[in-house]
Amino acid sequence: MRSIASSKRVCTHCLSHSRLFSTTVQHRAQPSSDAVPSSPPRSGYARLTNRGLISITGVDSTTFLQGLITQNMLVANDPSRATRRTGTYTAFLNSQGRVLNDAFIYPMPKGDGETATTDDPAWLVEVDKNEVSSLLKHLKKHKLRSKLKLRALEDGERTVWSSWKDHSEPRWAAYNLESESSSPFSPSSSVAGCIDTRAPGFGSRLVTPGEEDLRVHLPDEAQVAGSEVDLGTYTVRRMLHGIAEGQAEIIRESALPLECNMDMMRGVDFRKGCYVGQELTIRTHHTGVVRKRIVPVQLYAKSPLPSGETPVYDPTAAVALPPSGSNISKVDGRKGRSAGKFLGGVGNIGLALCRLEIMTDIVLTGEGSQSSPEQEFKISWSAPEEASSDTTEPAEVKVKALVPPWLREYISSGARNLARKVDSQEGHRAKELLYQLEEEEEQRRNE
């Protein structure tokens, strides 16, 4: 009998129209559990009971999704514009370019009952389980006269899994996601899946029929390694890799895809055509600087400032967990703009949307970083309304932002490209100024 960490869910509708760096702090309750999640094993798999599925079937389903998501539904650089054969990480945006839902999209397996009698394209959309009805409403709003059917799958119809193996060299997908050999499943298989590209070596995402154990469908040890772990342990592993997931962490109609690292996670195709919310995303990618990004954070009390580039999870650590949405500020106490927002956590680790040049040593522009190695940051919050003010004092915990090596490399390469672009622009302006001065000098000589 599997053990799944129980959690309290709160509606985030009241947060959907507020900016993450507003001066008014809106706290969201953190999931609570009687049992502290264990440290994730080097290999294993987890049943993701917090994820839901929507099926989209019909002749227009591919074109329909192509106009709504950040990823490309067609094979890149294919002159015949063939439909992609693999699943992918992606996002649905609103017209202002803010995230509605993070999602995975998979081709419907041919062995599935919904596609067994037709050659029409069909897709499975995996999304935060609490957001299925909201996304379904969004899809129906854009359906218009498209020839397709939308349906939310019932509990037990299919199960979403995360599976990972120990890799001596953490890296991106070992095979080309667009190649014919990218899918390990036979054409008649009822299993859907894809490489989870959100972090190097993070593993695979799989969708199986029914509620049976993953090994029933994939008995080969080469495909599934280790033992099943609970949802809480998967969450710890996800946060250690700096991956935000669901609208408790990627706030609906507030979060921006690049601030959520969706560009690095291969969730955005900057070469594809128009889709809802494309304008701001493309403009930021080509001309802007992403000053805030979601990174893993280490929570600590009075212990020394943690060292290292990645957080360390300690199930025995006695650290108070801040409410989601809490402001991060400098320990020195001087008032100033927020350095970041705490999004959620487990034990002594979590995720936060951080101003990189304040909370880390990353340099984004020629202005340099504003951070100091000795600078500490804190999260302070008041007692819950239901708690007695006579017995509960305001809580506080220290926090350190840690940029994983792969994210640091990605950001640095973008900064270098931006610097080269700026240098090129400055060079052109310098040449134009030189030509202008030469013309003015020539005119003075002729006078």
Curated annotation (Swiss-Prot):
GO process terms (BP): iron-sulfur cluster assembly
Source organism superkingdom: Eukaryota
UniProt cross-references to Pfam families, sorted A to Z: Beta-barrel_CAF17_C
Alphabetical keyword list: Mitochondrion, Transit peptide
Annotated transit peptide: 1-28
Keyword Mitochondrion carried by entry: yes
Cellular-component GO terms for this entry: mitochondrial matrix
Protein name, per record: Iron-sulfur cluster assembly factor IBA57 homolog, mitochondrial
Localization terms from the record: Mitochondrion matrix
Residue ranges of the region described as Disordered: 367-396
Listed GO MF terms: transferase activity
